[in-house]
Regions:
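Glycine-rich flexible loops
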Residues: 1-114
Length: 114
């Protein structure tokens, strides 16, 4: 699979598993000095290659990337890649169960995954 095809497949897999809802979340992968990232408002379960844009790995998080339609979470993806040079991809999802648990536990609470 190509990198973009991988992102399309992962988006569908997340949706099929019920881990994302409609427009909740975004995906990216590092490709050398480029990040391939889903567009703002892309539906992860229905991604097409046109929903993935290429932006520089490093750069200003302002106008050029916004005009390309990159996810508004691009600065977060860049920060993760900068902090973890070995990271090849970022999956940002909002599983309903995790969101519900965080609301039930309250701010600052922690829990152990099972």
């Amino acid at each position: 699979m190509s990198g973009v095809a991988d992102l399309v497949w992962v988006g569908a897999a997340l949706a099929d598993a019920g881990l994302v809802t409609s427009h909740g979340g975004n995906l990216s992968l590092r490709d050398g000095d480029v990040i391939r990232i889903t567009r703002t408002r892309a539906m992860l379960g229905r991604l097409t290659p046109a929903d993935v844009v290429a932006v520089p790995l490093r750069g200003d998080d302002a106008a050029p990337q916004r005009s390309a339609g990159a996810s508004s979470d691009l600065p977060v993806h860049r920060a993760i890649y900068a902090a973890a040079p070995e990271a090849r991809a970022v999956v940002h999802a909002h599983p309903v169960t995790a969101a519900a648990l965080s609301l039930a536990l309250g701010e600052g609470a922690s829990f152990q995954p099972v």
